[in-house]
Amino acid sequence: MAYTTIDDPSAYFQTTLYSGTGSTASVTNGGNSDLQPDWVWIKARNATRDHRLLDSTRGVQKELVSNSDAVEYTESTGLTAFQSDGFQHGGANGYGASGENYVAWQWKANGGTTTTNDASSTGVGGLDSVYQANTTAGFSIVTYTGSGSNTTVAHGLGNVPEVIIFKKRTDDTEDWLVYHHTQGNASAGKLNTNDAWETGSASLFDSTTPTSSVFSIKTNSKVNDSSDTYVAYCFSEVQGYSKFGNYTGNGNADGAFVYLGFKPALIIVRATDTDNWRMYDHKRADGHNVIDVRIIADTNAAESQDDNECDFLSNGVKWRSSSGGVNSDGQAYTYMAWAEHPFVSSKGVPVTAR
């Protein structure tokens, strides 16, 4: 069996940097493969601006903000089109304002083509849902309308999701919730805050681990209020392309090594205690170690630079800091990571070191 099924991760995930001009412009990706994104996460690097998250299921201009509990908002001069190898944006603050530099993390699902699951007809799940899934890359975007009763929802992955990111879209404000398999089915993180990982959350996921076809939700306004709409971003691991795990910090400058099985393009790290969601990628550090530039997903702050945060290696991440946000002694951390290149290709060719 081949080590990986994805030799070119840029077909499914890319990080792109661009600068705003105050006018409508297209952003073209620079990876080996063209990537028409279905989920785009944009952040101004040099300005205090909200994170902007948009997807091709909910449609252009429909933004959610990772650092806020706000409902879905329509920004007419924000992201205005998903294109064959990138996207088009207007001149709005946080998207294309003059003098602002941006990073855009982009994932491919199914090109905007969705599947409607009629639960009563298919027998899959207890609640109707709409999903667009990319089973090769282990990513699906699911939308559904809450029932207010304990139920299950089809996700379309065909594999068990290790991570699900939930957000209520309408009616009233609610926290983002993150299910992470390493924390169990009665625990949740809040993407928009630095609160400690919430334990004993049986009222969210019904203390039930997702299956290869559905995830479970209980009667809770964060995930299942009657008649309100929700989006869930679901991820399952693909060897050599994505990994969702945990590690324990050692508190030393010669820090913990996290084996991923690939050279990372993006890693999002979160302590299970009170701390921020930290985002590191290979582009903002100019493609070289040490990776010393981070963005915080739960604040609107500009990116910051610290000495010797980590190295991106051919097979994982080596922490070079004793920072409490990534490597405090004895502290447990969760992470989500996607590849620039697999450690070994499907033909057995190893990647070169960074």
Regions found by a protein language model. Give the residues of each.
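Surface-exposed molecular-recognition determinants
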Residues: 1-354
